[in-house]
Curated annotation (Swiss-Prot):
GO terms for cellular component: cytoplasm. It is an enzyme of class 2 (transferase). SUPFAM superfamilies: NAD kinase/diacylglycerol kinase-like. The keyword Transferase applies. One of its GO terms (biological process) is NAD metabolic process. This is NAD kinase. It comes from Desulfosudis oleivorans (strain DSM 6200 / JCM 39069 / Hxd3). NAD(+) binds at D57, G58, N131, D132, R142, H159, D161, Q231.
Length: 278
C-alpha cells in the first residue's frame, strides 16, 4: 500500500495515536491522507489502499461517507463508546497496522441502503447509509403516521414516535435499542423497526434486501425529521416521499486473523459463557 487514509475522532488520545501511526507509516514509505471532518462534497482519494478509522461507530460512519462508493477497505480502531464497527482496540493499533501492510486480512462486504428523498415529486437528495434511516418526531410533536409500502404493496401505517429502516450492520444500533432483532451482517435483509408504536401489533419486520421501501407521512405534524446514519437530517412533511433500497456498492471492512463477528457481539452485548449452573 502506497497511501493510507486516516479518519480521526476529535479526541486527544485518538489524535496522539494518529500522530504516532503517521510517523510509523512514513518510516515504512507509506503516505497518509488524514481528515477529522467529513462532508459530502469532499471525498477520499480513490487510490487509497485502506482507511484507518480511529474513533467510535460515529467516526466509522463518517469514514464510510468519506469514501463514497469506492471499494476502499475500512478498519475501525476503537476510541469511542460502543464500537460495534471497530475491528480492534487502541492497544493493538500497530500490530493491526503491521498485519494490514503485510496483506494478512480478509474483506467482509457490508450492505448499504440507498435513500432517495423526494419533495413534491422532485428529487431533493440521494444518499447511501451503512446503518439506518430514521424517521422520528421531536419531543413535543404528536404521533408520527408513517405510510409504508413494500414493492408498491400497501403494507401498513405505523403510528408512534417513528420508524427505523436498517441494514443488518445497523441492527445493533438504534434498531436494537428500539426492540429490533440482531441480524448477522451476511443475512440479506432489511429491518423495519417501529419506535414506541401506538399499535401493539406493529412489530419489527425483516424483509428481503431485494425490495423497495417507500415511506410517506399519512398526516403531517410539525417537527418530523429524517436522519441518515445519525450524520445528516432533513425535515419531512406530507409533501415528502422516501424511497429506500439496497445500494449498488457495499462497504468493504477489513477483518483481521482470528476476529469473528460473534466475538464482537458477545463482548458488546455482555453475553455470558456456558449454560446456567456451569
Amino acid at each position: 500500500m502506497k497511501t493510507i487514509g486516516l479518519v480521526v475522532k476529535t479526541d486527544p488520545e485518538a489524535a496522539r495515536n494518529a500522530d504516532e501511526l503517521e510517523k510509523w507509516l512514513a518510516g515504512r514509505g507509506v503516505g497518509v491522507v488524514r481528515t477529522g471532518s467529513v462532508s459530502d462534497d469532499r471525498k477520499a482519494p480513490v487510490d487509497l489502499g485502506c482507511v484507518f478509522v480511529l474513533g467510535g461507530d460515529g467516526t466509522f460512519l463518517s469514514a464510510a461517507r468519506w469514501i463514497g462508493d469506492a471499494p476502499i477497505p475500512l478498519v475501525g480502531i476503537k476510541f469511542g463508546g460502543v464500537g460495534f464497527l471497530s475491528e480492534t482496540v487502541e492497544d493493538d493499533l500497530f500490530s493491526a497496522a503491521e498485519k494490514i501492510l503485510k496483506g494478512e486480512f480478509t474483506i467482509a462486504k457490508r450492505m448499504r441502503l440507498r435513500v432517495t428523498i423526494y419533495e413534491n415529486g422532485q428529487e431533493q437528495a440521494r444518499r447511501t447509509v451503512l446503518n439506518d434511516v430514521v424517521i422520528n418526531k421531536g419531543a413535543l410533536a404528536r404521533l408520527a403516521h408513517i405510510h409504508t409500502f413494500v414493492d408498491g404493496y400497501d403494507l401498513t401505517t405505523y403510528h408512534g414516535d417513528g420508524l427505523i429502516v436498517s441494514t443488518p450492520t445497523g441492527s445493533t444500533a438504534y434498531s436494537l435499542a428500539a426492540g429490533g432483532p440482531v441480524i448477522h451482517p451476511a443475512v440479506p435483509g432489511i429491518i423495519l423497526t417501529p419506535i414506541c408504536p401506538f399499535t401493539l401489533t406493529n412489530r419489527p419486520l425483516v424483509v428481503p434486501d431485494s425490495v423497495r421501501i417507500e415511506l410517506r407521512l399519512a398526516q403531517s405534524p410539525s417537527d418530523i425529521m429524517v436522519t441518515l446514519d445519525g450524520q445528516e437530517g432533513f425535515e419531512m412533511t406530507e409533501g415528502h416521499r422516501l424511497m429506500i433500497e439496497k445500494a449498488a456498492h457495499p462497504v468493504h471492512m477489513i477483518i483481521l486473523p482470528g476476529q469473528r463477528y460473534f466475538d464482537v457481539l458477545k463482548t458488546k452485548l455482555k453475553w455470558g459463557g456456558g449454560p446456567a449452573g456451569y
